[in-house]
Amino acid sequence: MAHMIMMRKILIEKMGAVLFYQPGLLYGGSIEHDCNLQRSIGYYLEALLMLAPFMKNPLKATLRGITNDPTDPTVDRLKSTVLPLMKKFGIEGEGFDLKVMKRGMAPGGGGEVVFTCPVRKTIRPVQLTDSGKIKRIRGVAYSVRVSPQMGNRIVESARGVLNQFIPDIYIHTDHMKGANSGKSPGFGLTLVAETLEGCFLSAEMSSTPQGQGDPVLPEDLGRNCAKLLLEEVYRGGCVDSSNQSLALLLMTLGQQDVSKLLLGPLSPYTIEFLRHIRDFFQIMFKIEVRKPLEDERKGGDKVLMTCVGVGYSNLNKSLK
């Protein structure tokens, strides 16, 4: 965080139990960081995605470490769901991208990701009240330092579940070799369901890190990941459960106009995040429960979130 912020002050108490952190302006620019191997790159990207549009200069962040693990959102999931979501709020352009240069599984890492994001002065309000029906499913089955057949076995088992519901399914295999394959063996699957209204719902699973717990079969991983996607589709909404907090933050920071967003059941993380929004921005959301009719077959109960943005303006942005 200190790499991209013009720091004012960081003080650590002598006993190491207290940290005083006073940030300055969000400077941005080109940064490189070797992420701690206790968490994956997705853990760091979650914060970067929230801050990147409000930098002084366009951000180019090169992050090295673990790209895929069972704990944090993987880079594949963030690229497939978060970037399209942010584009709905007006955060887009040629310089908005997330690339996997090297793939690194837990626990050794060795992956590399490049995230680029333009700056924006304001965030536009949104009206996302209808998710629409699922029109297609896409995915990536990745593997490193194991047999390439692992990816094919994952794809076959996942399709065995999903083909019962929709024919338009394409899951490609990504097997990186040599220097691009990181330091640890592993495999996994990321699935994304796209709706007729351009909403994205996702699910993912990764193999157990080497030396940690019982190994998982690729067939079991593929089937279980497909079932997780079906559960996410049942929950529904215009944003999947892993990205609810980001969408609500962008609604809060939007122009002083009404924004509406239809979500599935709120996750515990999102509920706590709403408390933070209330404390820091004094914004309270109007929450309406939407119960689908029995003949609609639209999954579980939904929640319509409504708020008026604070009208945040990016004062860090360079004037040209």
Name what the model sees in each region:
Residues 1-320:
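Structural preference for solvent-exposed beta-strand-turn elements
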